[in-house]
Amino acid sequence: MHPEITILGKTISLYDTMYAVGFIGMFIMCFLSRKRYKLSLPRTLVYTVYTFIAGVAGATIMGYIYTYALDVASGGTYDPNSRVCIFGALLFLPVFMFIFSLFCGDTFRKLMDYMTPGIFFILASAKFGCLLGGCCYGIADEHGVYNANLDYTVFPVQLYESLCTLAVVIILLVIAYKAKKIRTGSLYPIGMILYCCARFFWENYRYYEHDFEQNYIFGLTFWQMFAVISIIIAIIWLVILYSVKGFRDIDLTPGRSKVAIAIDRISSGSAEKNRKKHAEKAKEHEKKAKELKNNAKKNKK
């Protein structure tokens, strides 16, 4: 694959382009499901933008953690290709979303359920961006795909990760819309378990230059270790959610903040304008209907 293309003299990074595709996809999902969660269009836009920024922040934090961990393991000789690790978006997003729930006027669990399918769609898009950009590539494979950065063919591990993550998105949407006994706040841990199981498997086909990357701890790669940790956390999350009544019933939103009030004012303002427009149109239709009735009576006479 080629990491960049040139259109009308401008060079475009395919990796960054897939992030844009992911953001648009997440917004569309949130837009289509906003009525189900009783959310206005302004809230949908604010939530989508915040989630995207929080995801980038989480990926950046994890990038520094990953670099530091491998630098220690290598004795200070590790030179990272990138300081952004998208796994961090999944791990740190609940923290950022919990903080946001204290100000936005919606509960943490509702917020997570609303954004979860879109979050995993961005992840799927980002992994496909890795394929196009030639990073995070798999082991050498003569039957694989050509990597322009390496000038040889490799196993398309990014493609399979992307497809598996898209499958996770579909499963989450089916659960959200079809499952009758699903508890609010369940979608994210379910998605984490499904994604991390797939990630753990596909890590066996990823290429690592150094032995300390391939065998970081107990024969696992760094990301396999975090996949296991994430699965354990997600299982605990679900157990608490389904078994501890006091936890699942508590309202984590302390009150309406200035941010929530401002968003609602924008929403109510646009809603009021729409109501006035509809009322004016209704009056016009009523007038036309009366005119038609009067004309019909005159013609009969």
Identify the function of each model-found stretch.
Residues 1-301:
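A feature for loop-to-transmembrane-helix boundaries and adjacent hydrophobic helices
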